[in-house]
Amino acid sequence: MLMTRPNLKGRSFLAEKDFTQEELLYFLDLAAELKEKKKNGIPHHYLEGKNVALLFEKTSTRTRCAFTVACTDLGANPEYLGKSDIQLGKKESVEDTAKVLGRMFDGIEFRGFNHETVESLAQNSGVPVWNGLTDMWHPTQTLADLLTIREHVGKLKNVKLVYVGDGRNNVANSLLVGGAIVGMDVRICTPETLWPAQEVIDLAKKYNEQVMITSNVEEAVANADVIYTDVWVSMGEEEKFAERVKLLKPYQVNMKMIKETGNENVIFLHCLPAFHDVETMYGEEVYEKYGLKEMEVTDEVFRSKHSKVFDQAENRMHTIKAVMAATLGNME
């Protein structure tokens, strides 16, 4: 059952902080409805005849696939523009690029590095712009996370979510602020040198004073409903690998940590890709250099009943579809 529909037509989706609790929950309700329609083969062409630009400065599997399928399901035409196709800030300014794309497309997705780039696209294009990831925020991921949590835990309010790992990255920032907005008990567990920026902590505390930032694993995971982790090194930070392995090894999600929650129904989430074995070239390289067969999560946890990572990956598509439909679609 959809809650009262807020008017989001024409809005850009750049960060969770730009939306109220009611608006974020509406995105989740709409995503659940669209997920059900897709499952039952019910057409939902809310973007019939629209053209959508998909700008990718950073490579992607899930984000690109999710936006492409979401566009197609909604009746829109997606146009992929990769790193070699766009000249943002090189041969053409972001402002000029935004103005050109806004004349040709009805909506723009951007996945890249600087958050200022997606803000400039939104400011200058005249069409809704959706953030597929920047160094600061990853809001489409957080919506998928929240939908997955609601499906498996049954609610969001007062749910204890523990993010373990690099607390300064975009996923941690978005979970901290987005989770606080919807009333969750968010805990970031990481070494002090990797705590979120103070401005992000302060922003989260505006919505929920209960947020916890700690380096103590036992304290963080006690009674947790959700354990969440991400890669130890983000794209563009590869030179920090040895340092991060040393820092974050005690924060690996393993069965000992799962048991320390005291909750046999605790769920495990990861935005993927996850380094839980040596079945990739990257995994082999890490094993050769550092002797680690598993990194941020053990294979045992990744493949266990606790793991909901593939539901979470699928939900990227449904939540992205909801964001595009609500901000660009004909929802009457």
From Swiss-Prot:
Listed EC numbers: 2.1.3.3
Top-level taxonomic group: Bacteria
InterPro entries: Asp/Orn_carbamoyltranf_P-bd (IPR006132), Asp/Orn_carbamoylTrfase (IPR006130), Asp/Orn_carbamoylTrfase_sf (IPR036901), Asp_carbamoyltransf_Asp/Orn-bd (IPR006131), Orn/put_carbamltrans (IPR002292), OTCase_ArgI (IPR024904)
Alphabetical GO biological process terms: arginine biosynthetic process via ornithine; arginine catabolic process to ornithine; citrulline biosynthetic process; L-arginine biosynthetic process
Gene3D superfamilies noted in UniProt: Aspartate/ornithine carbamoyltransferase (3.40.50.1370)
Molecular function GO terms recorded: amino acid binding; ornithine carbamoyltransferase activity
Pathway in which this enzyme or protein is active: Amino-acid degradation; L-arginine degradation via ADI pathway; carbamoyl phosphate from L-arginine: step 2/2
Family listed: Belongs to the aspartate/ornithine carbamoyltransferase superfamily. OTCase family.
Function: Reversibly catalyzes the transfer of the carbamoyl group from carbamoyl phosphate (CP) to the N(epsilon) atom of ornithine (ORN) to produce L-citrulline.
Protein name, as recorded: Ornithine carbamoyltransferase, catabolic
